Amino acid sequence: MHTKRIIPCLDVKEGRVVKGINFEGLVDVGDPVALAEYYNKQGADELVFLDITATHEKRGIMEKVVQSVAEKIFIPFTVGGGLQTLDDIKSILRAGADKVSLNSAAVRNKMLIKEGAFYFGSQCIVLAADAKKRSDNTGWNVVINGGRIDTGLDLLKWIEEATALGAGEILLTSMDADGTKKGFDLELTKAVSDITNVPVIASGGCGCLEDFYDVFKSNIADAALAASLFHYGELTVDEVKRYLHDKNVSVRI
């Protein structure tokens, strides 16, 4: 079993971290740099920043955030949200991100994956796929725009196509499980893991220590991502890793 990764995720709007964060001893919980350092110290393997700023004009703010974070932490970090063009990807990578995550833009223009992988390498291009189960239970569709638009695209076909175009990793979010705290969607994660050779990051639904173990024990995910669980201090990255280590899951301690 490869070493499994634990990845906190932060939503950033206009240069500030949003979505309630509750840490004792952190003066400014809205500062992405302070939070990145905090998670880095806790032993996070990577970080994901999602820029949820609506307007393109404010993209420059995110570049400054990325630059400040890159100066302070020494773990890989991925930046996504609103990256539409090759130039957008280039500026975020140049600012110091290790990888970019492409979601809605890749669905609208799949050549962005191919060009990104060609210029920057597949290892830089993460396909963020948000999945929703079809009402007839025959599989999953890809949803975009934060889950608001059902593209009608079959998820598994889309992942096969995106990896063939050069996506080097899949950030897979179950929109059905997201926010429920009832555990990762194991059926979905396994279905994706079965059809691809690139690493899969499970996201959406994590509510307790056992949920991390469940997604790793059957070896259907290479990494697990969580947000509110870490932000509210319910668990620390270190606690998760020690628990997994005790359960014989290979993690970096």
UniProtKB/Swiss-Prot annotation:
Chief location category: cytoplasm
SUPFAM superfamilies from the UniProt entry: Ribulose-phoshate binding barrel
InterPro entries: Aldolase_TIM, His_biosynth, HisF, IGPS_HisA/HisF, RibuloseP-bd_barrel
Record-level Gene Ontology MF annotations: imidazoleglycerol-phosphate synthase activity; lyase activity
Catalytic residues (positions): 11, 130
Pathway entry: Amino-acid biosynthesis; L-histidine biosynthesis; L-histidine from 5-phospho-alpha-D-ribose 1-diphosphate: step 5/9
Gene Ontology cellular component list: cytoplasm
One GO BP: L-histidine biosynthetic process
Top-tier EC class: lyase
Location of the protein in the cell: Cytoplasm
Any coiled-coil regions, as ranges: none
HAMAP family: HisF
Task performed by this protein: IGPS catalyzes the conversion of PRFAR and glutamine to IGP, AICAR and glutamate. The HisF subunit catalyzes the cyclization activity that produces IGP and AICAR from PRFAR using the ammonia provided by the HisH subunit.
Entries under PANTHER family matching the protein: IMIDAZOLE GLYCEROL PHOSPHATE SYNTHASE HISHF, IMIDAZOLE GLYCEROL PHOSPHATE SYNTHASE SUBUNIT HISF/H IGP SYNTHASE SUBUNIT HISF/H
Self-association state and partner proteins as the record states: Heterodimer of HisH and HisF.
Protein name as catalogued: Imidazole glycerol phosphate synthase subunit HisF
Originating species: Clostridium beijerinckii (strain ATCC 51743 / NCIMB 8052)
